Amino acid sequence: EELFESILLFVTKNGYIKLVSGAEFETGRQMIAATKLDADDEVVGVIMLSASDVLTGTKKVILLTKDGLSLGFPLSEVSELKKTSRGVKGITLEKEDTVAFATVVHPAAETFEYEGKTLNARRVRNRKRAAKGQKANLMQNTLTLE
């Protein structure tokens, strides 16, 4: 029931992104296609959001690529589409680069987790959806005592 009342954010390795109403997945069949993908594409993240997350538009999407680029943009820039659509461009990628990770954070968030590391959300530059990512040192500053 929680799925049907939520909105899902899909992100693919080729940089496509879309919001899909959870109600679209209500079916009597056991298996359904969740999204349309190109032959060389795959889903790297599905994030369950509440309707209020999407309606208020205050959340921020963060995308990280395998080549170390990052891009942040408002969730309000992501279109709500049907599950059968491919999505809209979330990030402009270089030829061999792909999206490695996606998350949604509150704009005031200081950090987020990726591969067991705490990264600094404030170092992800806010730009428009579909922009090129930028190199950024996202490692959290830590103090070490010797």
Per-region residue spans from a language model:
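C-terminal interaction appendages of subunits in large macromolecular complexes
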Residues: 1-146
